[in-house]
Regions:
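Long, hydrophobic N-terminal alpha-helical segment
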Residues: 1-34
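Short glycine-/aliphatic-rich beta-strand segments at the starts of folded cytosolic domains
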Residues: 5-9, 49-51, 88-92, 114-118
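Beta-strand elements of well-folded, non-transmembrane domains
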Residues: 9-13, 28, 55-59, 98-100, ...
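Short, conserved charged micro-motifs
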Residues: 16-19, 58-66, 125-129
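Short amphipathic alpha-helices in soluble, non-transmembrane regions
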Residues: 21-23, 64-71, 132-133
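Short, charge-patterned binding micro-sites
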Residues: 35-59
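Mid-chain, well-packed structural core segment of small domains
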Residues: 66-99
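Glycine-rich, aromatic-bearing surface loops/beta-hairpins
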Residues: 93-138
Length: 138
């Protein structure tokens, strides 16, 4: 199955870059070298880091397996049962709490998030739910 995972997050000057990369490696086995880091200036010229990664093939499959295995059962079931609500034109779009991940907890969130986009080709639109549910079970 063709699979791609995009991970995006924003780090502010007050956040510990080293700790964030450590937690990403511990929780998802993604090394710092697999991320691109771009430094930009914030509204008040404070440094902001835009961090992103694009995982493909085996690395993407490993991430997806780890990601869903670490998710709370209730949140997994919510996404699984209503997967169409989380699918955009670019794939399965999820946001997890950056702060909770620093404590080793994977939790969905709407604020201060790590954006996760999991995409795989869907050739027949009415199979979207089935394809993404199969992906979540692996």
């Amino acid at each position: 199955m063709q699979l791609e995972v995009k991970i995006n997050l924003i780090l502010h000057a007050t956040e510990n870059e080293k700790k964030v990369f450590e937690e990403l490696e511990i929780n998802f086995q993604i090394e710092q070298s697999e991320f691109q880091v771009e430094e930009v200036s914030g509204h008040f010229y404070n440094p902001i880091l835009l961090i992103s990664s694009k995982l493909k093939r085996k690395t993407a499959q490993n991430f997806v397996s780890l990601f869903f295995s670490k998710m709370k059962k209730e949140e997994f079931e919510e996404i699984f049962n209503y997967v169409e609500d989380y699918v955009t034109s670019s794939g399965l779009s999820l946001r997890i709490s950056k702060q909770k991940l620093m404590s080793g907890i994977l939790a969905l969130s709407r604020e201060d998030t790590i954006k996760i986009n999991i995409s795989t080709p869907v050739y027949v639109k009415n199979e979207t739910k089935k394809i993404y549910q199969e992906l979540m079970r692996k």
